[in-house]
């Protein structure tokens, strides 16, 4: 187990990595696409959240660590979705929002606080960020399917349709 946040079974035939900054308003808007992709493909597509905290968002790195603690407590995606719906609060109020969201979801906030202090999830966040840089991720959200990278940080326009084309083509090739 890698600790990665995934919304499907490991045997899913198509992997979609979503490189995300949890303080990024564009990543919040990308959730609609994620929900639509889940509805359309179900477990035929594994959507994995990958951390790419941007320097301009001062709470994004802590938010990524908090998200990994939510994964450890079994509520990764609900936490991510709740936190992304509060990007303005996070930017304005800072790290207390991370614990507020955990509390609202019934997670162990003491363990959250401890995880943020002891840095137990730093390696996952650092590894994601390094891998993202290595493959050319520069902004968020960025989607990667196989060797195709789609930058949603510049524009969300038509992005879901392009993702669906790639997924459909990949699934068709595997079904032959």
Predicted regions located by residue number:
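Structural alpha/beta surface segment adjacent to cysteine/selenocysteine redox centers
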Residues: 15-103, 173-174
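Context-gated lysine
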Residues: 1, 56-58, 133, 154
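A short beta-strand-turn-helix
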Residues: 1-15
């Amino acid at each position: 187990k890698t600790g990665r946040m995934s919304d499907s079974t490991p045997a899913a035939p198509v992997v979609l990595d979503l490189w995300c900054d949890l303080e990024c308003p564009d990543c919040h808007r990308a959730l609609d696409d994620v929900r639509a992709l889940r509805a359309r493909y179900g477990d035929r597509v594994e959507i994995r959240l990958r951390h790419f905290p941007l320097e301009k968002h001062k709470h994004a790195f802590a938010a990524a660590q908090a998200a990994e603690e939510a994964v450890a407590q079994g509520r990764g995606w609900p936490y991510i979705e709740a936190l992304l719906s509060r990007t303005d609060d996070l930017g304005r109020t800072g790290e207390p929002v991370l614990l507020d969201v955990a509390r609202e979801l019934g997670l162990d906030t003491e363990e959250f606080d401890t995880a943020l202090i002891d840095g137990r999830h730093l390696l996952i966040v650092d590894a994601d960020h390094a891998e993202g840089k290595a493959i050319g991720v520069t902004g968020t959200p960025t989607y990667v399917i196989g060797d195709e990278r789609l930058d949603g940080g510049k524009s969300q326009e038509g992005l879901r349709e392009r993702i669906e084309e790639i997924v459909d083509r990949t699934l068709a090739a595997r079904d032959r």
